[in-house]
Amino acid sequence: MGKKLYTKENISKAETEWLGIPELVVLKTNRDDVGLEVVHRRYFEDEKLLCPACRSSRTRCSKIVDRKLKDLLWLDEDHKTFQIISLLFHQRYMRCDNCGQSVFPEPTEFGEKGCKFTNRLSDALADGTFQFSYKKVCQHYGVPASTASVGEVMRRRIQYRESLLPPVRTPHIISIVEVVFLGEFYPAVLGIWDGEVYCLDILRDSSEETCGAFLKTLDAKQVEIIYVDPVDSLFNAVNQYFPMASIVVTDEAVQRYARNAMLDIIHSDGKRFPVVHKDRRLTVLHKDLDDRTVVPRIKEGMKSRPRLQQAYNHHQKLLELMETKWSMEDLRTWADQIPAEVDEFLAVGDIIDIFGEQLSGFLTLGEKPPNNYQFAVQGICDAIKDMPHCIFDVMRGRCIFSITHDTMEENGELWRYGIKSSRLTEKINEISANIREERDYGYQ
């Protein structure tokens, strides 16, 4: 195919107007097996594409690659009725006669490279996937639910939604907490304003580069205190960007790591334990149990599980200690008394040993975390941990870009605080319920 194959007489003006993609023209065709055959508008123009390697205009068509795509056409202004269209796009690949070795595809804007959906269909799929499963949304639109395409579909829409957000208003207190999702750790960056906890973002990994890329967008002069999980790369990043801030490890972090260790023991040694909701009831203070009738069942279950009994007793000691005015010496004593059989707690002992200076710094802080801080962090961690299986981009999109951010206006400029922790937890659980219950997506 080249300029000899089609002329302007081959253009179907009515179908081109009906399709409504500015850069494409529809060709007259008698083929019923391919939907609409389309080429780029520049196919009929004298424009010479520049070589991306040497910027020369001495380029010519080298070959044609046919791309099959699905497109979405809305049939009403309310975007409730639609039609899915098959497109066969004849995409030209150009060769540069100047540098001789460069072969490149003609650039397009209506669809991403490698994606089998046009951007307007891709955007509709992404908007639905923020709230429902990708498979359910694809079923609604009648297109294949390829897992290979979900990342490309979501990343484009995430970039768009992110571009609409106002800049972050830098809080005086920042917290960086690693949340666990499908066995991987992702730093959640939290801000504290007027006693409320807000989520600013969830980062792809805990590396210094990733964490630093976000932190440098904040105003270092405004940050006074940073609560950081005991992870070396996170500490290196915050020390680099906020050298004047007080950087500490909180009692909440110690309790969270101890709780995670306790959960590992419950899952390995507590199979068929005679208590409903054992993960929650075996990780809270004995005196705070919401149902006292489970106390005899806990005692009964522990009789045949000596390692779980040891872990439970030692974890209870830590929880009781944290309710008092504890000291570093108290924590070290608890760590020294970790039973040899319960090596899951050794990681908590390492935190107390290695990050003792940062824990001591927390004790001397004039301003402690708000009363709801531990509850807010645990709620976020639990909600994300229980989200249905998906890739990171989908998880982050559902958490950060499908929930309303709190904003404020100052000197005529709009700023955002982030997402209030209670709203974040509620919406994540709602989205997870949508997916688990396989609720219908659409307008039925």
Predicted regions and their residues:
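Conserved phosphate-handling catalytic cores of large alpha/beta enzymes
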Residues: A258, M262-D279
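Inter-helix linker motif
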Residues: M244-L263
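Acidic/histidine-rich catalytic cores and adjacent linkers
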Residues: K48, A53, T59-R60, G183-F185, ...
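Short, conserved DNA-binding cores of transcription-related domains
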Residues: M1-Q101, P105-P107
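Residues immediately flanking
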Residues: N98, E178, P230, E252-V254
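Single, functionally critical "micro-switch" positions that shape active/binding sites
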Residues: I176, E252, N372-Q374
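Short, positively charged, Gly/Tyr-enriched micro-motifs
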Residues: L72-F185, K221-V223
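RNase H-like nuclease fold core
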Residues: S149-A237, M244, E437, Y441-Q444
